[in-house]
């Protein structure tokens, strides 16, 4: 009798240990995704276009009615030969809490995205997604395919920090409030581009866009590539666009569309910084107002093929023939000549544009009679 009781207790304990070893997500409603068996790493793609009700899993939850995907410590390490590792329908809001990671792990030829928004099922990345919250998303594509990308679709970043490895391919990009996008191209990225935008870019509030391109055989590859003929760049308030010194692409910010006049960049606040191996900024027209400022430098030219609109009574434009000159050392008088800036006939390799804050006395129309005592 005692032996039977011991065997019964052993069986109960064994069953309890088996249940404990099963990941909690295995019991989550609607969860049908593979884990690595030792942690809460999800190893299969998630397609939220297929969801028909609220669902949740390890580090994520989906509100079907509002199309809201909340990420809270999710870790997805998956390969896919379809749309992307995580696909969301048009109009989805993604809320970031904590630290989140999504990786496309296939290192072979894989023409995929890490995270994309889709409207038409047959067309990738034609949808819009809004990202908010105060967390972090690390999105990485490890594919060696030149068409492999990190993010896709029209992106509105209202908050949180997104660190994207692999080209961000977007129809339009908006960064507001405290949103931060750090984009890094890989050696496999098409033409070494970090951010490829077919529409416009808007950065305001305290929003920040940083893009680092890779060296490439393309004649004028860039960290930020813009291709639309009808859109513009807009930087206002405390927003910033930065292509830092580590950029290895030939151009920092480049418009490649067929509009011969280039693309306008309206900078009324914040700062634009652009380093490029050849040009800092190319075929982008700087329209300066308010408190906006620019630092741009290139191995050959600071700015090329530009039609600027800058009131020199309100802004100071200085230059240097030195590549990567420190901003405080850029003091030379520049002259605009056919789309380029020069200093004494030599090409300006660094140009700084900023509001004129020097003391000035401005006299308006005077009326009345001025008298002195005898």
Tell me what each language-model feature is.
Residues 8-11, 18, 27-374:
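A composition-driven surface/loop motif
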Residues 1-8:
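Positively charged n-region of N-terminal signal peptides that target proteins for export
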